[in-house]
């Protein structure tokens, strides 16, 4: 069957897919992960449909907080799994994401919202 969309494991991979698709005259939604500033530009320019912000800084901070509490006094997390809500960034909420990146808070606070 024909390929109708591509979800890449990272924005860097999505950039490569976009170049190959464009060189071959193919148009389809391409989605990456990481919310790199270059991905926001690619979304604005119509070369990438979306990126997903996963907040790696918040992931590592949360993991370290859990580890340090356990090492300090044996405190275990209330829940076995800790979930952070990723944000899908598209043209619809791109302005919010760009403002957050400009302010330097995209990864620290998770502010790009629809």
Which residues are covered by each model-predicted region?
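Structural detector of well-ordered beta-strand residues that form the stable sheet scaffold
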Residues: 7, 29-31, 49-52, 89
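Hydrophobic alpha-helical
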Residues: 1-42
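Electropositive phosphate-/nucleotide-binding environments in soluble metabolic enzymes
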Residues: 11, 54-57, 61
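Short beta-strand elements at the ligand-binding edges of bilobed clamshell
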Residues: 45-57
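Hinge/cleft segment of the Venus flytrap/periplasmic-binding protein
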Residues: 58-114
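Short, charged, surface-exposed secondary-structure boundary motifs
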Residues: 39-43, 60-63
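Residues at the C-termini of beta-strands that transition into short coil/loop
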Residues: 34, 55, 92
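Sec-exported extracytoplasmic/periplasmic mature domains
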Residues: 1-2, 18-26, 44-48, 65-72, ...
């Amino acid at each position: 069957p024909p390929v109708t969309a591509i979800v890449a494991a990272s924005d860097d991979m999505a950039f490569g897919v976009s170049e190959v698709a464009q060189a071959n005259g193919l148009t389809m939604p391409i989605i990456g992960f990481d919310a790199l500033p270059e991905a926001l530009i690619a979304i604005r320019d119509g070369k990438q449909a979306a990126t997903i912000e996963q907040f790696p800084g918040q992931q590592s901070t949360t993991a370290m907080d859990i580890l340090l509490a356990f090492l300090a006094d044996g405190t275990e997390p209330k829940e076995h799994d800790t979930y952070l809500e990723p944000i899908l960034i598209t043209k619809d909420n791109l302005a919010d994401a760009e403002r957050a990146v400009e302010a330097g808070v995209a990864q620290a606070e998770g502010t790009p919202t629809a």
